[in-house]
């Protein structure tokens, strides 16, 4: 299976368990890796035969900027489901970064990574 990756998609969301996270919001970063067969698109040099990653990026940002959820795990699941709706995408790996998570000790990043496939 081939891979198309989008790294470092950035969007502001109001996700989190604490009221301050919901009120103020924070920046989330998202990395996605789409699993699909790119051979038909490559053979014909035809965008219509592959995933349009610009559209996927816009949809992912819309999820992050959309309805708030408590857990990063839930956000990752919603992003995965949006990606799997694209024809030809058989698998997706989603990594959501929450670099400003409310943690009381020094840290670089918090991430949740999930892998989902078509059933």
Curated annotation (Swiss-Prot):
Per the record's keyword annotation, is S-adenosyl-L-methionine included, yes or no?
no
Q: Does the UniProt entry include the keyword NAD? A: no
**What protein name does the entry list?**
Dihydroneopterin aldolase
Q: Please give the InterPro entries that the UniProt record associates with this protein.
A: Dihydroneopterin_aldolase, FolB_dom, GTP-CH-I_C/QueF
**Protein purpose:** Catalyzes the conversion of 7,8-dihydroneopterin to 6-hydroxymethyl-7,8-dihydropterin.
Q: Which reaction does it catalyse?
A: 7,8-dihydroneopterin = 6-hydroxymethyl-7,8-dihydropterin + glycolaldehyde
The pathway entry for this protein reads as:
Cofactor biosynthesis; tetrahydrofolate biosynthesis; 2-amino-4-hydroxy-6-hydroxymethyl-7,8-dihydropteridine diphosphate from 7,8-dihydroneopterin triphosphate: step 3/4
UniProt keywords (A-Z) are: Folate biosynthesis, Lyase
Record-linked SMART domains = FolB (SM00905)
Biological process according to GO = folic acid biosynthetic process; tetrahydrofolate biosynthetic process
Q: Where does substrate bind?
A: 21, 53, 72-73
- Name the GO cellular-component terms: cytoplasm
| Catalytic residue list | 98
Q: Which domain of life is it from?
A: Bacteria
Q: Which GO terms describe its molecular function?
A: dihydroneopterin aldolase activity
- Might you give the EC number(s) for this enzyme? 4.1.2.25
Q: Which family does it belong to?
A: Belongs to the DHNA family.
């Amino acid at each position: 299976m081939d891979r198309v990756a989008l790294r470092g998609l950035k969007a502001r969301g109001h996700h989190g368990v604490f009221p301050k996270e919901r009120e103020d919001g924070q920046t989330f970063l998202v990395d996605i890796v789409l699993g699909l067969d790119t051979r038909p698109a490559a053979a014909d040099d035809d965008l219509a035969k592959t995933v349009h990653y610009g559209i996927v990026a816009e949809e992912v940002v819309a999820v992050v900027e959309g309805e708030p959820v408590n857990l990063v795990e839930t956000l990752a699941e919603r992003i995965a489901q949006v990606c799997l709706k694209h024809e030809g995408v058989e698998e997706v790996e989603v990594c959501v970064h929450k670099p400003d998570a409310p943690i009381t000790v020094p840290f670089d990043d918090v991430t949740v990574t999930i892998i989902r496939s078509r059933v």
